Amino acid sequence: MSFKDLRSFIEHLESNGELKRISHPVDPHLEMTEIADRVLRSKGPALLFENPVGNDMPVLANLFGTPKRVAMALGKEDPLALRDVGELLAFLKEPEPPRGFKDAISKIPMFKQALNMPPKTVRNPPCQEVVKTAEEVDLTKLPIQHCWPGDVAPLVTWGLTITKGPRQKRQNLGIYRQQLLGKDKLIMRWLDHRGGALDFKDFKEKHPGDRYPVVVALGSDPVTILGAVTPVPDSMSEYAFAGLLRGERTEVCKAISCDLEVPATSEIILEGYIDPEEMAEEGPYGDHTGYYNETDSFPVFTVTHITHRKDAIYHSTYTGRPPDEPAMLGVALNEVFVPILRKQYPEIIDFYLPPEGCSYRMAVISIRKQYPGHAKRVMMGAWSFLRQFMYTKFIVVVDEDVNCRDWNDVIWAITTRMDPKRDTVMIENTPIDYLDFASPVAGLGSKMGMDATNKWEGETDREWGTPIVMDEAVKQKVDEIWSDLGIDDAPTL
């Protein structure tokens, strides 16, 4: 099943018991966060607050609060099925030469499908049913969530920021938080390495002093939203990838104030510009680390136009100590990463980003070890292969007999197969999440790799221990007589 807009996905979730309408008045100032946090931690449904205090625009929260709903957004029922998406991405990133004529013929449909998914431009789009300009523009009339007591101001969280640089043929879609600064101003918090910031940098170099056009889409269809957080190949637009997943082209329309193309079925569109000379202090805000972050200076986004659908829905979230919605999104997208990594490193058995590690700060990788030093090669490869892992501080590599998603197994491997000096890799002065205040310098810190694999000749001079395993015949016999022993139900092994 595919969804052309957010509303059809909401209907699908509600019909499947995955969305709850809240008619009781709830304040976007702190109350929504507390309710959404409790529901997410109990693995509850998406929430549609129909009567936000001080506003008549409904607020959608906790949309991707479980891996299952992330899968449902992509037309899947099981998060493990997201590996199909990873297989597709792996193919698009590095298609293998055909092994023969029949293989070449079999791959034609996939290439054809990928090439035939440019966005479809539509007229009279739903996102422009209502148009506000000049004095009508007032961001304070949106039910923007104020998430935590120490937050400096309300925060736009789920906006798809649409930019285009002079060096790129395609647009970039990115999700960057935006602090409410005034009726027509937001602070655009994008880090230097992110696509929007790079586009802006290139624009300033080519057009010094000029205003930079920017558009933010709120409440887009779920596939386009997820396309913006998926490792799409640089040569492919997020719109084309979303169309590929959906099975039909993404509908877009031209923005009113500039040439940028926006998702036509979005609930709300903010159009405007960034003046390269206008900066403002952003923060502090509670973030996915579970702490309030430091303040810093970022560009100001001036909104000149607000367009929206009739009876628009405001899509929002919060970030905090895991589990939060980004962490659950990370758990689901973990399955997308596995095939991509395996394509480059076939020896990888499994890959896990534990949500407790703030989605990406720690990774555990199980491998089919083939030679001394193999674990260290995999560490280096994971850090450098995808930009999503640039900020991963800790990588633990284990053997294929260890379940990398089970901390009992992982801790056992670390404590029995590692020597701290020999098996720990430390790398200094590497890119680190700017929000990681544990690093000695903002944006620059160290990484640690832990080789928790069995050691081969050349890695140790000692005889390596053999794991204790019970005889299978004995286990089978005990299974057969268990009910006669008068012991409670057999434990699950």
From Swiss-Prot:
It is a peripheral membrane protein. Binds 1 prenylated FMN per subunit. Its cofactor is prenylated FMN; Mn(2+). The keyword Nucleus does not apply. One of its GO terms (cellular component) is cytosol. InterPro entries: UbiD, UbiD-like_C, UbiD-like_N, UbiD_bacteria, UbiD_Rift_dom. Keywords: Cell membrane, Decarboxylase, Flavoprotein, FMN, Lyase, Manganese, Membrane, Metal-binding, Ubiquinone biosynthesis. GO terms for molecular function: 3-octaprenyl-4-hydroxybenzoate carboxy-lyase activity; metal ion binding. This is 3-octaprenyl-4-hydroxybenzoate carboxy-lyase. It comes from Shewanella piezotolerans (strain WP3 / JCM 13877).
